[in-house]
Amino acid sequence: MLSSVLFPAMRTLLLLKYVFSLISLSAICCQTVSAIPVVSREGLPMTLSDKCAEALISDVACDPNVLDFKPGYYYSPEILQRACTDTCKSALDSYLDRVKSSCGTETIVGPFDLEVSALIVPGMRKDLFQKTCLQDNGRYCNNVAATAAVIADPGVSRFNYLSSVPPGTVPPDPCDIQHVCLYVDDQSMRNIWATIDYYSYWVLYIINAGCYNMHRLNGTELCISAPGQKFVPGDATDLPGATVTTPVPAPSDAASGSNRYCGRWYGVKKGDYCNLIVLKFGITMDNFIFLNPALNSNCTNLYAEESYCVLPVGDINTYSGKPGYVSTPTGSETTATGIRFEDLPDATENPYPRPPPGPPIAEGTRDDCNYYFDGAEFQYNVTNTYWNSNCQIPPPQVYRVDPESFESWNAGLGNISRPECSFKPGFRYCGRYYALSDDSDEPTPTTPITTSDDPTSTSATPTTPTTSSKPSPGAPTMTGQPSACNKWHTVTNGESCTVIPKTFGITLEQFLAWNPTVKSDCTENFWAGYAYCVGVKTLGPS
């Protein structure tokens, strides 16, 4: 019964398919190829010259399928016969020559936002054409490769079906089955549907990309899950030591600054990079940089032949600097002895005399300066002197600071080089925001130096601060450090050059200016055991 209905229907379908194939081939053979543009003007950058742009958007005498060629894709013999012509090959060669002569060294933005030559457009198109249209003894290699891929791994191919399976037979690789049931008008298809046994696995056609041939699968059963045994992930992980409770000793080549409270170290080899390491050890980039603070935010200063921490001890959120950190006291608890605060007698000593608060702070002046002065101290006649106004006298002569810093601390003065700039008597101004070293002199107001014999002008000789012997660095130093340096610091293992300036009350810019051999990100010439300048008596804070 099945064969009497099935095989006539199959012969009818195959005959129709053969007729339509002949019609399609005749249409392909008779169709002419028109010229097509390789790229559109809208896709080109505005920086290209008109001559180069015209060359890139010029037409080539190729089939439109040529523009759809992609590496690793397979195409039907009909498409290749239509697209792979000598005319198209010559057109692509001419297109390359036109772009080469018109564009010269002009560039466009290529893959990964890289700047590349404009020749990449015709070059890539010609390369894809040659690889896709490659032939051997009259056969397209693209078709041979497609057949080999199907045989090696059929997947959902037309060879993956059985006409029938004996009753009671269990497929070796069972899968979830979906019975296809579609309403069709063709009486013969309904007859086939009525006679097919439930266990039949007749699939004459595969599903195409748009599912437009589902009606041909009426009455069949399709596998809708991966065949075979379902994958069940195990409990074990291939990441060694996912959680450790005790730190391991740091190796001798441990990177400077890396956290020594570490559960695992990894020695970086040539060719390694940060993304590879974090994937290998299952750690996030943020945590990897947190455990190795010498690495910059982009992780571009990873050094080979050094070991880095790749696993925290316990929960990384309990580390100092993380939200879960709790400072735990060490040692045994002791019982407090002595008198309770509540039982202490009331104080009877008279408080020491406190100095008066002084004049009010001038408008725009900082309220947290280390040293203030009264505006009445600088009321001089600066005619025929080096200065345009009294505001220029305190910074270099008394407080040894640069004018820019002085202006920022006293924003209400504005530009201190203006002749109309002056201090208001009875108001305090910031003379120095920071404290100088212990051996520095206390600032003393100085009258300006006269430059003429005008008896009406006030003149005086500025006070010269006393000097003291400069301290010895106490360790090897770098070149370029100032001779006036009066404070040194010897770097120890694990120290960061971003922390040292904060320790000594200076800025990172000052530290780098006094130690010019140190790179701005402290990755070069910042060595343990070397002394670095952290204070200059005559140039700034220490």
UniProtKB/Swiss-Prot annotation:
UniProt region (Disordered), positions on chain: 439-484
UniProt-listed InterPro entries: LysM1-like, LysM_dom, LysM_dom_sf
Compositionally biased region (Low complexity): 443-472
Localization per Swiss-Prot or TrEMBL: Secreted
GO molecular function: chitin binding
GO CC aspect terms: extracellular region
Residue positions the entry lists as glycosylated: 218, 298, 381, 415
Domain LysM stretches: 264-310, 487-534
Keyword Glycoprotein: yes
Superkingdom in the source lineage: Eukaryota
Signal peptide location: 1-35
Keyword vocabulary terms for this entry: Chitin-binding, Glycoprotein, Repeat, Secreted, Signal, Virulence
Role: Might have a role in sequestration of chitin oligosaccharides (breakdown products of fungal cell walls that are released during invasion and act as triggers of host immunity) to dampen host defense.
Entry domain remark: The LysM domains bind chitin and potentially related carbohydrates, and might be involved in damping host defense.
Protein name, per record: LysM domain-containing protein ARB_00327
